[in-house]
C-alpha cells in the first residue's frame, strides 16, 4: 500500500491534485448546505471525474512495462558495433489498465562512460490493448560503453487536466569498438639485433617455408609440384599442399596515453583506431601481436595469435583514455621486463621525432626493434616531415598520419 501511494504521489503534480480535491470539497459542501437535485447531480459528476483522475494516477504510466532492443551491427550479420555507426533503438511499451490514454511521451537518455549523454523524446499512441512502439536512431557514436538510464513516461487524461509521470528501468548497455581500417600490407624494416637475434626483412607478406601445414582446395594457377596427389585421389577433387609461413618477430604495440601530448580528443581517437587496425592486421597475418597502453595505470597484453586474446585487446581499447601525467619512459621502465627481446616495438604517439628518439634509443638498448607511428594534426605537415626524417636518418622505420585513411598507404610505403 505504501509503495502504491508513493508511486501515486510521485507521478502526479501536487498542485493539480490539490485543485481537484478542492473542487470536490466545494461540491460536497454545496450538497450538504444547499441540497436539492441540482447539487446532488453536480456532486455525482464531480465525484466520478475525481475518481477517474485519481484512479489514473495509480495505474497507467506508473505500471508501464517495456522491452528495449538495440539494432546495429546485428543487422549486418554481427553483434559488434564500431565507432561512427548509428544505433537503431526499438522500445516496446505496454500500459496496463482499462482507462483510456490519448498519448504518452517517452524520454530516453543514453549515457556514455565518460559522462556524455544524449536525450531522445517522442510520443507514443497506445492501441486499445495499451501497447505501443517507439523507434529512433542515435547519431554516429564514438567508441566507449553506453547504457540507457531510467526511461521517463508522461501522460495526461482525456480531458488534459492531470499530468502523470512514471519511470521504468530497462537494463540495456552495449559497447562501441574503435574505428578500424583494412591494412593490406605493412612493410617493416626489422634490423638484425645482437640481443634479439632477428634477421633483416622488408616484406609485405610472409614467405612460405617447405614445411607442409595441411591441405587446401586447388586454386587456378597452382604449380603441378604443389598438388597433393594422395588427397586428390581420396576426395576426387583437386587438392593443393598448404605450407607454413615464415614467422615475423612478435610485435608490441605501445599506445602513448599522455594527457598533455594530444591536442584534442579526436587526435587520441585516431591513435586508438590505428592501434586497433594494427591488431586486426596481426590477426590477419597470424603474427603474434601484443599491446601496451601507457595510461595512468598501464596495462600490458603479451603477444598472442589467437582470437580470444585479440578481442581482449580490442575490448580494452574501448575504455582506454589519455590520462597519464608522467613521462612515457617512466611507464616503460616499470614494465620493460615483460617486453619480449627481439620483438618489434611500435610506438604510437603524438610526440615529435626528437622526443621519440630518446624512446627509440631505450628500445634498442633493451634488444628490441624500434618503430614509430606519429599521430599529428592535419595542419602540422611541415613539422611532421622534419620529425620523421630525423628518425629515418637513423634507419628507424617511421610513419606519420593525420587521419585514419592515410594509415594503409603510410604503412605500405615503408620508411
What name fits each language-model region?
Residues 1-67, 79:
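Extracellular/lumenal glycan-associated context and N-glycosylation machinery
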Residues 25-27, 153, 257, 371:
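Generic recognition of cysteine residues
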Residues 48-301, 344-348, 362:
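An amphipathic, basic-hydrophobic helix/alpha-beta surface used to engage anionic
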Amino acid at each position: 500500500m505504501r509503495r502504491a501511494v508513493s508511486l501515486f504521489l510521485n507521478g502526479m503534480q501536487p498542485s493539480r491534485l490539490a485543485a481537484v480535491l478542492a473542487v470536490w470539497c466545494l461540491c460536497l459542501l454545496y450538497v450538504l448546505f444547499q441540497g436539492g437535485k441540482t447539487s446532488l447531480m453536480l456532486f455525482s459528476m464531480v465525484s466520478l471525474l475525481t475518481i477517474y483522475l485519481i484512479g489514473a494516477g495509480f495505474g497507467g504510466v506508473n505500471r508501464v512495462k517495456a522491452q528495449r532492443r538495440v539494432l546495429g551491427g546485428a543487422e549486418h550479420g554481427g553483434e559488434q558495433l564500431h565507432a561512427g555507426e548509428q544505433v537503431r533503438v526499438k522500445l516496446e511499451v505496454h500500459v496496463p489498465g482499462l482507462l483510456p490514454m490519448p498519448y504518452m511521451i517517452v524520454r530516453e537518455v543514453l549515457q556514455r562512460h565518460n559522462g556524455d549523454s544524449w536525450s531522445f523524446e517522442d510520443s507514443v499512441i497506445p492501441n486499445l490493448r495499451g501497447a505501443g512502439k517507439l523507434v529512433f536512431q542515435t547519431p554516429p557514436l564514438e567508441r566507449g560503453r553506453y547504457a540507457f538510464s531510467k526511461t521517463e513516461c508522461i501522460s495526461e487524461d482525456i480531458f488534459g487536466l492531470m499530468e502523470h509521470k512514471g519511470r521504468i528501468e530497462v537494463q540495456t548497455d552495449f559497447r562501441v569498438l574503435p574505428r578500424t581500417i583494412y591494412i593490406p600490407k605493412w612493410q617493416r624494416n626489422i634490423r638484425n639485433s645482437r640481443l634479439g637475434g632477428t634477421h633483416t626483412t622488408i616484406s609485405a607478406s610472409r614467405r612460405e617455408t617447405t614445411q607442409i601445414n595441411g591441405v587446401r582446395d586447388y586454386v587456378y594457377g597452382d604449380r603441378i609440384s604443389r598438388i597433393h596427389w594422395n588427397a586428390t585421389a581420396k576426395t576426387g577433387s583437386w587438392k593443393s599442399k598448404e605450407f607454413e609461413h615464415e614467422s615475423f618477430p612478435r610485435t608490441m604495440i605501445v599506445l602513448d596515453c599522455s594527457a598533455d601530448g594530444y591536442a584534442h580528443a579526436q587526435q587520441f581517437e585516431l591513435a586508438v583506431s590505428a592501434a586497433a587496425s594494427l591488431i586486426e592486421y596481426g590477426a590477419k597475418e597470424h603474427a603474434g601481436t601484443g599491446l601496451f597502453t601507457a595510461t595512468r595505470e598501464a596495462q600490458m597484453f603479451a603477444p598472442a595469435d589467437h582470437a580470444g586474446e585479440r578481442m581482449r585487446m580490442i575490448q580494452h581499447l574501448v575504455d582506454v583514455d589519455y590520462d597519464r601525467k608522467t613521462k612515457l619512459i617512466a611507464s616503460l621502465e616499470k614494465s620493460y621486463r615483460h617486453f619480449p627481446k627481439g620483438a618489434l616495438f611500435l610506438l604510437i604517439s603524438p610526440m615529435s621525432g626528437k622526443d621519440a628518439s630518446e624512446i627509440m634509443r631505450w628500445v634498442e638498448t633493451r634488444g628490441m626493434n624500434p618503430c614509430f607511428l606519429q599521430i599529428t594534426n592535419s595542419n602540422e605537415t611541415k613539422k611532421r616531415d622534419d620529425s620523421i626524417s630525423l628518425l629515418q636518418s637513423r634507419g628507424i622505420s617511421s610513419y606519420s598520419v593525420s587521419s585514419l585513411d592515410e594509415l594503409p598507404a603510410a604503412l605500405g610505403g615503408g620508411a
